[in-house]
Amino acid sequence: MTHLNLIPVFNGLIQNQPVQLCNARELHAFVESKQQYTDWIKNRINEYGFIQDEDYLVITERTNGRPRKEYHITLDMGKELGMVERNERGRQIRQYFIRCERTLKALQQPQQLALPEPEKFTHEFTEFEIETLVWLLIGHHQMNTLLGQLEKPLDAIGSNLHPAVYSYWKEYGRQYKDALPTIKRLMAPFK
């Protein structure tokens, strides 16, 4: 039995690394577990030692005014959960996740080959160009601060924008942290 899309797989960030994720609730429905969803996911997390913000993210959503936890799990976690079901549906979902990973790897392969090594580039900057880069970094930092201020209120009201704002907030923070030493190095001759 072949399926093109057994359950939706989407991109996300865990520890500032891009990963493919799926919703554990949809996986639970697909493998046709007889356990109630909340018991099933909590038992599996405890029994197999999955780690929050490494193997999965917990997103709180509001449905009809009630908060509901959604577990966005990595495909590695999904494969393991599929294996432990020990049924045909578990085997199918495991194979499906393996195909998703292979597809992503194949799509990324040409891009990795095309990237030049950064050490090979040399360029001289004028003081004005460096000043422009500094202002860009400051704007980037201010956007990160704004996203950080929006994240908790959006989570508190259960906004469906929360996961995206949270991801962007973390990514802007990582980029700022990575770019700051480079800007300082470029500014050193002008002090």
UniProtKB/Swiss-Prot annotation:
Pfam families on file: AntA, P22_AR_C
Protein known as: Uncharacterized protein HI_1422
Species of provenance: Haemophilus influenzae (strain ATCC 51907 / DSM 11121 / KW20 / Rd)
